[in-house]
């Protein structure tokens, strides 16, 4: 989910000394071991004697083997033998019964932080902080399985509502939390609404009720959704296209995001990360309609830190060179997301708002509209500070709530996040990953075989 800030000016170079770590996997790591069976030669060897005794002995051996095979078949129904369905509906905890979820991509720290990899004190701190990592890795595994299914499932002619609900239903099924009972959505589920922003719209668009928009073959659609487990949010996004003409635009964002992740680390300045991202992104160009177009960073869209139950933390990660001297710190979680555009490289609020969130620092205001009071109580109980959309309110059975919702926004209690768009006729793309700065290494939680 995008963060929007003002751009600064400074120029720093990308350090290419990072070594590429091993990717995490998105498959269950428990496998059934093969059981050796007695060979026919052994059976014949045991029955060398003649007469009924030898025949009875052979028969008994066969009878003994059958129960063993049946028992093994029974154990094959354990969680390790299960696989995900299409669409995804198998609880992720059934695929990983011991809560042993795959690590993300492990990146060793560089330069003055390289000592952290083997430092005993840092290793001890790493071992002490495993509980929250389990929640993050569980959310990341759900994100991988859902997005990989969605990327193959999405086709031209589908409505945005169909796509959004397909992704969200899958996330809820894998977490085991449908979010219909009071407080259930705060235990696990959607970290924020599914963003499906098309072409010049870069971020924060999800269909409201009655939306009939259909995705077409020539569209460039950003698919941005989050999964949370106990408030630990994994935020990751990819760009879905059908026409290969847009491949260079998509690749520019992927490469720029990877450059930002490579540069990021403990005590690294935000300005350095922004410079690294911009250098890579703007080295690309794309030919559309016979015109060669440069790919520009959308300079007022940024990555961000992620807090507990808070998708946009207190820090932003620029995607252009600037003068921000803020540093990343040990233990922080960040989403690095990059946006490339063939337009102005600058977005503005446009179209109908769908995304909202209760402000963590919301003022205590006397609400005079009764519908606003009841709506605020429902938002607080069901979402807390997690972002939500109008469809989520519809799903909970709310009716005629717009007056109350607008009152909460105007009172400063709820923040509205309107769609962010470049100029019409332009194309925009996005790539995003979430990582955590562990004491000994940088773990890219959302990394998968797909991106």
Swiss-Prot record:
Compositional bias per record (Low complexity), positions renumbered to this chain: 74-83
Acidic residues: bias regions: 35-45
Residues that, per the record, bind substrate: 204, 312
Enzyme class: hydrolase
Keywords: Aminopeptidase, Cytoplasm, Hydrolase, Metal-binding, Protease
Residues the record lists as binding a divalent metal cation 2: 235, 304, 337, 432
Entry EC no(s): 3.4.11.18
Annotated stretches, region: Disordered: 1-97
Cellular localization per UniProt: Cytoplasm
Compositionally biased intervals (Polar residues): 19-28
Entry cofactors: Co(2+); Zn(2+); Mn(2+); Fe(2+)
Any GO CC annotation of this UniProt entry: cytoplasm
Residues the record lists as binding a divalent metal cation 1: 224, 235, 432
Cofactor-binding details, from the entry: Binds 2 divalent metal cations per subunit. Has a high-affinity and a low affinity metal-binding site. The true nature of the physiological cofactor is under debate. The enzyme is active with cobalt, zinc, manganese or divalent iron ions. Most likely, methionine aminopeptidases function as mononuclear Fe(2+)-metalloproteases under physiological conditions, and the catalytically relevant metal-binding site has been assigned to the histidine-containing high-affinity site.
One example of a Gene Ontology biological process annotation: proteolysis
Record function comment: Cotranslationally removes the N-terminal methionine from nascent proteins. The N-terminal methionine is often cleaved when the second residue in the primary sequence is small and uncharged (Met-Ala-, Cys, Gly, Pro, Ser, Thr, or Val).
Protein name: Methionine aminopeptidase 2-2
């Amino acid at each position: 989910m995008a963060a929007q800030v003002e751009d600064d000016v400074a120029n720093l170079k990308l350090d290419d000394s990072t070594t590429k770590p091993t990717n995490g996997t998105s498959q269950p790591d428990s496998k059934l071991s093969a059981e050796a069976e007695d060979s026919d030669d052994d059976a014949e060897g045991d029955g060398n004697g003649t007469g009924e005794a030898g025949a009875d002995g052979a028969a008994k051996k066969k009878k003994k083997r059958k129960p063993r095979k049946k028992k093994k078949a029974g154990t094959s129904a354990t969680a390790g033998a299960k696989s995900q369905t299409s669409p995804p509906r198998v609880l992720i905890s059934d695929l990983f019964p011991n809560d042993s979820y795959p690590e993300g991509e492990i990146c060793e720290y560089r330069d003055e932080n390289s000592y952290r990899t083997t430092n005993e004190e840092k290793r001890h701190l790493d071992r002490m902080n495993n509980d929250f990592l389990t929640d993050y890795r569980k959310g990341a595994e759900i994100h991988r399985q859902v997005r990989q299914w969605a990327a193959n499932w999405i086709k031209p002619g589908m409505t945005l509502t169909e796509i959004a609900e397909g992704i969200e239903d899958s996330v809820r099924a894998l977490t085991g939390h449908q979010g219909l009972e009071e407080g259930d959505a705060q235990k696990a589920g959607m970290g924020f609404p599914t963003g499906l922003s098309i072409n010049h719209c870069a971020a924060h668009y999800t269909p409201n009720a009655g939306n009939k928009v259909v995705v077409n073959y020539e569209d460039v659609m950003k698919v941005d959704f989050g999964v949370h487990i106990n408030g630990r949010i994994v935020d990751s996004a990819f760009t879905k296209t059908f026409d290969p003409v847009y491949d260079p635009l998509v690749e520019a964002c992927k490469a720029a995001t990877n450059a930002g992740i490579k540069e990021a680390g403990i005590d690294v300045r935000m300005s350095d990360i922004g410079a690294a991202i911009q250098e890579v992104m703007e080295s690309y160009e794309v030919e559309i309609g016979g015109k060669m177009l440069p790919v520009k960073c959308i300079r007022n869209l940024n990555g961000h830190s992620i807090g507990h139950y808070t998708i946009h933390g207190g820090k932003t990660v620029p995607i252009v060179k600037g003068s921000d001297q803020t540093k990343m710190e040990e233990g922080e979680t960040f989403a690095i997301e990059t946006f490339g555009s063939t337009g102005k490289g600058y977005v503005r609020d446009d179209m109908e708002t769908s995304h909202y969130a209760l402000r963590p620092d919301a003022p205590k205001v006397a609400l005079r509209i009764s519908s606003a009071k009841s709506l605020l109580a429902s938002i607080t109980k069901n979402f807390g500070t997690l972002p939500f959309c109008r469809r989520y309110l519809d799903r909970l059975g709310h009716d005629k709530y717009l007056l109350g919702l607008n009152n909460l926004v105007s009172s400063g209690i709820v923040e509205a996040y309107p769609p962010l768009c470049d100029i019409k006729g332009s194309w925009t793309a996005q790539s995003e990953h979430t990582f955590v700065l562990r004491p000994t290494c940088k773990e890219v939680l959302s990394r998968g075989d797909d991106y």
